[in-house]
Amino acid sequence: MDFEEMMKELEEIVNRLESEDLSLEESIELFQRGVELYKKCREILQKEQLKIIDVLKELEGDEDDAGRNQEDES
């Protein structure tokens, strides 16, 4: 299941918990599933955030190298 599918299911769970008259057992099961999905989504987002940080560091390094090359040519 990918991130978007998990988010969609999580939204559906929230909507059901907010709008339906559920038994305590059903509510707890849905809540537990929601927490599970939340943790997986958070993990994915944290991994993607690290990738973005790495890309930005590479970009900064490229800009620093380009600046040094221009200084060397002067």
UniProtKB/Swiss-Prot annotation:
One of its GO terms (biological process) is DNA catabolic process. One of its GO terms (cellular component) is exodeoxyribonuclease VII complex. Keywords: Cytoplasm, Exonuclease, Hydrolase, Nuclease. Disulfide bonds: none annotated. It catalyses: Exonucleolytic cleavage in either 5'- to 3'- or 3'- to 5'-direction to yield nucleoside 5'-phosphates. It comes from the Bacteria. The keyword Nuclease applies. GO terms for molecular function: exodeoxyribonuclease VII activity. Its EC number is 3.1.11.6. InterPro entries: Exonuc_VII_S, Exonuc_VII_ssu_sf. SUPFAM superfamilies: XseB-like. It is found in: Cytoplasm. Its main location: cytoplasm. Pfam families: Exonuc_VII_S. Bidirectionally degrades single-stranded DNA into large acid-insoluble oligonucleotides, which are then degraded further into small acid-soluble oligonucleotides. Belongs to the XseB family. Heterooligomer composed of large and small subunits. NCBIfam families: PRK14070.1, xseB. PANTHER family: EXODEOXYRIBONUCLEASE 7 SMALL SUBUNIT. This is Exodeoxyribonuclease 7 small subunit. It comes from Thermotoga neapolitana (strain ATCC 49049 / DSM 4359 / NBRC 107923 / NS-E).
